[in-house]
A protein has these predicted regions:
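Catalytic or ion-coupling anion/metal-binding cores of large enzyme and transporter domains
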Residues: 1-224
Length: 224
């Protein structure tokens, strides 16, 4: 954020000490266990939703929130339900070329970390799929940038989540014909990922449609 950037500059000039720098850094994070910067870690969180290995809307819910605790419980139930003792859904059978394309489209549409060029190639290789930088360049050329998240703007991942987050993004990418809506996920298909979680009256997780309009067009815009 601007204040953290200012303090870093002042520290580099020798005008403030390490204590002031640490105070500014700590104040930039909303809760323990979070990273507001849309770098490698959060880009991978986005990818996990795009390939359907996350529960819908789970990527950017903060630690310590009641919703995060409920999502953790629900994820445990889902992991058990798709294990060998239930509706067996191994990742090796679920992830295919459509999943990888969806991941790359998500990366380009959100302006994610360039480190994902390496991460996604490795991820694809583990599924027996060859993904090259040229493949990513060709996908990038036809994928609109729908998000502006720090460091591409002053807004962090929490602002992105509040503006509509992954549910809104996935729905827009499907609407634009930019992703494979039929790619398999732990929830069914990618089309089933275009949802946002909330806690129902019984304290359990429920899902609803994402908002029809972006909460902030400077951060997250529709595909058309």
């Amino acid at each position: 954020n601007p204040e953290k950037a200012r303090i870093r500059q002042e520290f580099a000039r020798g005008n403030v000490g390490r204590d002031k720098l640490l105070e500014a850094e700590a104040a930039s994070y909303h809760a323990p266990g979070t990273c507001t910067f849309y770098g490698t870690a959060n880009s991978n969180q986005m990818v996990m939703e795009m390939v359907g290995l996350h529960l819908p809307g789970a990527a950017f819910v903060q630690p310590g929130e009641e919703l995060r605790t409920a999502l953790t419980r629900e994820a445990t139930k889902k992991a058990a339900a798709i294990s060998i003792a239930g509706d067996y859904t191994p990742a090796g059978e679920m992830i295919d070329e459509r999943s990888i394309v969806n991941a790359v489209v998500g990366l380009m549409a959100t302006g994610g970390s360039t480190n994902l060029v390496l991460h996604l190639a490795s991820f694809a290789a583990s599924a027996g799929i060859v993904l090259t930088p040229q493949d990513m360049a060709e996908i990038s050329a036809v994928t609109p940038l729908l998000c502006r998240i720090y460091p591409n703007s002053a807004a962090d991942v929490n602002h992105f989540h509040a503006a509509g987050g992954m549910g809104f993004l996935i729905r827009e990418l499907i609407k634009g014909g930019l992703v494979h809506a039929d790619a398999r996920t732990i929830n069914g298909t990618l089309a089933d990922q275009a949802m946002e979680p909330f806690i129902g009256a019984d304290g359990e997780i429920e899902w609803r449609e994402p908002p029809e309009t972006s909460g902030d067009l400077e951060i997250l815009r529709p595909v058309d």
